Amino acid sequence: MYNFKEVEKKWQDYWEKNKTFKTDGYDFSKPKFYALDMFPYPSGVGLHAGHPEGYTATDVVCRMKRMQGFNVLHPMGYDSFGLPAEQYAIQTGNHPAIFTNENIKTFGKQLRSLGFSYDWDREISTSDPKYYKWTQWIFKRLFEDGYAKYIDMPVNWCEELGTVLSNDEVIDGKSERGGFPVVRKNMKQWVIDIPKYAEKLLEGLDELDWPESTKEIQRNWIGKSTGVEVKFDIKDGGEFKIYTTCIETIYGITFMVLAPENPLVDELKTRIKNWDEVVKYREETAKKSDIDRTELNKDKNGVVLEGIYAINPVNNKEVPVYLGDFVLASYGTGAVMAVPSHDQRDFEYAVKYNIPMIQVIEGRDTKESAFEKQDYLGKECKLINSEEFTGLTVEEAKKAITKKLVDEGKGEEKTNYRLREWIFARQRYWGEPVPIIHLEDGRSIAISDEDLPLVLPTLDDYQGKNGKAPLENDPDWVNVEVDGVKGRRETSTMPGSAGSSWYFLRYIDPHNDECFADPELLKHWMPVDLYVGGPEHAVGHLLYSRMWNEYLYDKGLVPVKEPFKKLVHQGMILGSNGLKMGKRFPKYCINPSDIIRDFGADTLRLYEMFMGPLDADKPWNDDAVVGAKKFIDRVYRLYTEDNKISDKENKNLDKIYNQTVKKVTNDYESLNINTAISQMMIFINAVQKEDVFPREYAEGFIKLLNPLCPHVTEELWKVLGHNNTIAYEKWPTYDDSKIVDETYEMVVQVNSKVRGKINVSTDTSDEEMKKLAKEIDNVKTFMEGKEVVKEIVVPKKLVNIVVK
C-alpha cells in the first residue's frame, strides 16, 4: 500500500535539506532555461485550485529541462504590496505588514507541500525593503529622465477605497477590488509616461511567442492610428483642434462635440447661454468612468452649448457645439467632429437631438443608419456634397483634403495612440513610498541613492480620510528639510503594479545590494524562456513590465528589449457546476490543501494536468481525482509488487516505449501535458499485459513520470536500487527505428479534382498533411493566384483544398 503522506513529506524534507533545486546562476557551462510563474498575491485564504495548475505546468517543463542538461532557473516570490492586503487588514483589524508576512509563510508552506522545484533561496516579496529599494531606484531614474511626472489630470477616484485607480483596475464603473463605485475627478497625480513607448511596445509584439489574442488586446489598447489634426475656429473668438482618421467626411460635419471636462468649456462660460444646464451635465458625467462613457451600446446623451458655434475650415459653415460624455478630455484633443451620416454614434446622437445630417460618400442610403468607414473603405466609393472634391474616390479625397488643410495651415498629419499615462500613485498606505520630496520653493526632487530604501513607516492609523493619504498621519516622516529648504515627502504610495513590473530581473540576483542584478547574470539569463499566467493581465502587468524593461534596455541596464520570450495562459479551473469558484457557490470551491491531505500532492498535480488543454477552462470532477490517485497506485504496485522488472528484453514493448518517450517529450515541450499523461497510461496498460518489464524501460518511464509526480517517482527510483535523487538523471531518448508507424497514401484534391498524392504515417497531424499537400508542384499550379477558402482532411483518404 502506497503511503503518500509519508513519502511526500520524506522527499520534501530531502529536497529542502539538500537544496536539490538551488540554481548556480554563474554556471554558464550549460544551456540556460528560465521559467517563471506569475507570482501570487499572498491572500488570507491561501492557495486556491487555480494556483497549482500553472505552477505545475512550469514545474513539469523545468524538471524535464534539468534532466536534459539545462541549468534551470525556477524561482518563486510574492506580489505582497497593494490594495487587497490593505483592504483585508482594514476589514479584520489587522496591520497589513503582520497580516502579509503571516500569509507569505502560509503560502510558502502550501507551495512546498506541492513539491514544486523552486530555488527557495531566491524567494522575494515586493513589500521587503531590500526589494523595494530597487523599485524606488528604478522609479527615480524614470523621474530624472522625465518619464515619471507629477501632473494635474482627470483620474478614476474610488471614495470607498480612498484612492485613485488605473483604467485596468476599473470594471463597468466599479473598482476591480471590492466592486465600489468609481467617479472621475481632477487631481495632482504621479504618472508614468508609457505613451512615449507606444511605438516600441507595438513593434516588440511581432517578435514574441505569445497567444495572438493577447498580442491583439495589447495592440488595441495601445490603439495606434494615423490621421489629421484640424483647427476649428469658434465664432466670435477662440479655437480648438480635433483629430480624425476620416478626413474624407469633413464636409458632412453638422455639429461638434467637446468633452464635458474640456477646459475650453470654462473659457466660454460667459458666452454659453444655458450655463446652469451645462454645470448639471458635467456633474453627472463626473460620476461615470471612462469605460462607462465610451460604451458603444449606451444611450447617447449630451447638452448643446447655446450661443457657441464652430466654423468648418473647408467651407466656413457654422455648426453648433455640444457636450457629450462619450468624448474624453484625456484622449486625443478632447473634441470631435460629428458626421452623423458616416458614424453610427454620431447618427444616434443626431437622431436624439434632431440634428441635420449630410451624406458625403455615395454607396447606400443613410436615413436608417450611418454608412461607416468599414463599409466604404477599399470599395472605390466616391464623394458627394463635397465641393471641389466631389467625384473623387475616398482614397483620393483623403490625400487631397489633407493637402488643402496642410497648405492653408489649418491641419497637420499626425499619428495618435489610445494608450494613456499609467497612473502611478495610490492614496493608500500599503505600497512603496515614492522617493520624492516637494520643497517649499516649488521644486520636486528625488532623494539620494544612499537614502534608499525609503522605508514605509509603521503606522497604527493607516486609513486615509477625506482623500488624504494615510502617510499624512506621520508628520515626523512627512516633514523634512533639504539644504535649509523645508519640504514634504510625497505621501502617495506606488501602485501594486510597481513591484511586479521588474521582479523577473531581481530573481536573477536577489541578494545583490549593489545593483538590482549583476549585468553578467542578466546577460546570461534574460529573457525569460517560459512565462505562465492568466490572460487578465494583458493590459496591466504584461504591458507595464514590457515598458519598464524597454526603458531599462534603453538605459543599457538590461540586455534584451523584451522580457518574456514565450507566454502561455492557463485556463480557469471551474467548480463542478461549471461556474467560476467563489463566494457565490461556496460548496463548489476546492481547497488544494484538502486534496493534498486526502489524496496527495502527486495526485493533485497529475489530475490538474490531465483535466484538459492547459489553456482551456475546465470543470472540477471529484471522480477524476480518484482516478488520478488510482493510476499512481497502479504504477507503485507495478514497481513494488508485480515482480515484472527484469534485465531481460521484451520486444513487445519496444515500439510502445519509444513512442511514449517521443510523445511525452514533445508534449511536455509544447505544454500538451494532458495528452502526455494519456500516452503514459497507454504504456502502463501495455506493460501490465506483459510478464517482463525491461529495467531500461522501467527506469525510463519513471523519469518521464517524474516531472508530474515527483514524490512517488523519487521513491520508486530508490526502489530500483538508486541512492541519488532522480532530479538530475539523464532524460530518456527514443529510437525512431523502433517506432514503425503504419503509412498510407492519401489523395490530394484542389476543388475536388485529384492533383496529386502524399504518403503519411498514422501520427501525421492534419496540419502537417495540409502542408505536405500544398508542397506538391501540381497542387501549387492550381492554387497559384487564388485564395484558399477551406482545407478539408478526410482521415486516411484525402486532402481537399478549396480555392477561388
Predicted regions and their residues:
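Glycine- and acidic
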Residues: 38-47, 119-124, 328-336, 383-387, ...
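Conserved oxyanion/phosphate-binding beta-strand-loop segments in alpha/beta enzyme cores
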Residues: 1-36, 66-75, 98-108, 210, ...
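Residue patterns forming the tRNA-binding/recognition surfaces of aminoacyl-tRNA synthetases
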Residues: 10, 14-18, 91-247, 335-451, ...
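NTP-handling and nucleic-acid-processing catalytic cores
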Residues: 2-12, 49, 135-362, 463-478, ...
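Alpha-helical recognition segments enriched in aromatics with Gly/Pro capping
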Residues: 308-314, 318-331, 360, 472-616
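N-terminal catalytic cores of NTP/NDP-binding nucleotidyl/phosphoryl-transfer enzymes
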Residues: 24-96, 100, 123-138, 244-245, ...
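Helix-rich, typically C-terminal accessory recognition domains appended to large enzymatic cores
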Residues: 79, 144-158, 332, 413-442, ...
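Conserved phosphate/anionic-ligand binding catalytic regions in large, soluble enzymes, centered on
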Residues: 240-262, 422, 428-430, 434, ...
